[in-house]
Amino acid sequence: MKAKRKYILVPFDYSDYSIKASLLAFDLANKFNIEIIFLHAYQDEESNVSEAANNAKDFYDKEIKAGRLPDAAYSFILRKGVPEDEIKRFIRRDEPLVIIMGTRGKDRKINDLIGSVTAEVMDISEAPVFAVPESVELKSFNEIKNIGYATSLSDPDLKAFESMMEFMKPYNFTIMFVHILESGEVASLYKGKIDYLQNYISDKYPNINTAFKLIPAEKSLAVELNDYYVANQIDVLAVKSNHRNIFSRIFVASLAKKLVFQAKTPLIVLH
């Protein structure tokens, strides 16, 4: 059985968007008193790979000392190999609490937006993956007030929800469950499941507010969700992927890219 110790994994390539995402990792690590592991994988012979890691360490140490960054233990691991392969090997041996990754901005091609590495990690990881677009100014989890949770409501899906709450439990926020009604579906069909989820969450997480929205499908799913999230000031989007369902895997990867591109919203992929 795969181990799951308390640490945060940050796949790292020294880019501006990697550094921006890492600020959230320090915030979370300080809250839970756990370690951050920066994993840098390189394919070519990089003569300056150790120097780059040392420069990054100097930067973080100075930020912590100046009080601009929460104090947290961290370490760098350097691996030669294909990034997604090295990440896969690492998390298979020792599963993290959450993986936090930066993503490129909207000036990139849409297929490159999440990036092949991030998309691959979203697909293979059992741990939640938190993807932060470089255009998003988010330095603390305390800034997250509204989470949009895209759900099929075909199942209470509590396992995926609980994996998110493992690292979001200390914070106060509203989670908005959003379901797009397909042709012929009526909202009343889901009343029992909605009542169950509301009662479960209010009993176990009294500091969390819930809201439910069932939207008739008139546009594409990505556009419907994006319109709702923009109108309701959603800070983070959460979606569930099913490793065993190839349609789900393809759908979530495609939806994730479109939503982050259109709404420039941080994304949590759950399993």
Residue ranges and their predicted role:
Residues Q198, K219-V230:
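A short, acidic, amphipathic alpha-helical segment used as a generic capping/interface helix at domain edges
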Residues A73-F76, F212:
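Rossmann-fold cofactor-recognition segment
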Residues K4, R89-E137, V230-H271:
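Gly/Ser-rich helix-loop-strand patches that form or flank binding pockets
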Residues L78-E86, A217-A222:
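Charged docking surfaces used in two-component/phosphorelay signaling
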Residues M1-E51, K145-K193, Q198-A211, I234, ...:
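Small/aliphatic-rich secondary-structure junction motif
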Residues K65-D71, D203-N207:
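Short helix-capping segments at alpha-helix termini
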Residues L28, E86-F90, D94, E224, ...:
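CheY-like receiver
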Residues V49, D112, N142, A160, ...:
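Short, well-ordered secondary-structure micro-motifs
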